[in-house]
């Protein structure tokens, strides 16, 4: 991804750093209108997820996470921007005439060929075939992968964000051991499929929106500290001037501990599959 800096004509362009290479050119048979109701509110209109609201209208691009087009070679035709995710997507033209969107693998360029299925090679000569999808049982150890299935046939659910990559570190019995982007080490069935390579748009965290209006277009509302609120709005609020929070430890707006509290459900079915907890 190439970061583009504007000439300093206004404060917003002076501080902004955007990607100017990838554009959006969606295909009509692969896009759908979506009604983004709520925007952080529940059915009663109460805010349940903060800092959400507004934003530009979006068309949903149908992404092929299942990669169930078996043993039919496809070719990358375009690399496009998707407003619904921070990763890029690429349009694939398959040999039988069908067209699908997939997540753009880092390093893949227009004209590259991809294929999914069993016994699919991840190399062609000395070149890596980024974007090929195959079961974990057919991948060598140490392979960098993304778009990983948890349930066989359900489609990829892990490592789908921009720059995300997991690593296959072991295979034993019916399970494969993966190290996920969060640092978590867990077991997954060897029959589940994954895509070879890393998700593209690695430098997404280097972008700078430059002004509040650009953040508003993304549907993100301002973040307000609890210490500057009133007591009715937050436990940290109130006081005269720059007052401390008045508690031993920081809390959420609903009074629960804010730092270090585990949010994962207890006795979840997948606890036995996690060998090491996430580190970030």
Curated annotation (Swiss-Prot):
The keyword Ribosomal protein applies. Keywords: Chloroplast, Plastid, Ribonucleoprotein, Ribosomal protein. NCBIfam families: rplB_bact. Part of the 50S ribosomal subunit. SUPFAM superfamilies: Nucleic acid-binding proteins (SSF50249), Translation proteins SH3-like domain (SSF50104). One of its GO terms (cellular component) is chloroplast. PANTHER family: LARGE RIBOSOMAL SUBUNIT PROTEIN UL2M, RIBOSOMAL PROTEIN L2. This is Large ribosomal subunit protein uL2cz/uL2cy. Residues 1-25, 231-280 are annotated as: Disordered. The keyword Aminoacyl-tRNA synthetase does not apply. It is found in: Plastid, Chloroplast. Belongs to the universal ribosomal protein uL2 family. One of its GO terms (biological process) is mitochondrial translation. PROSITE patterns: RIBOSOMAL_L2. One of its GO terms (molecular function) is structural constituent of ribosome. InterPro entries: NA-bd_OB-fold, Rib_uL2_dom2, Ribosomal_uL2, Ribosomal_uL2_bac/org-type, Ribosomal_uL2_C, Ribosomal_uL2_CS, Ribosomal_uL2_dom3, Ribosomal_uL2_RNA-bd_dom.
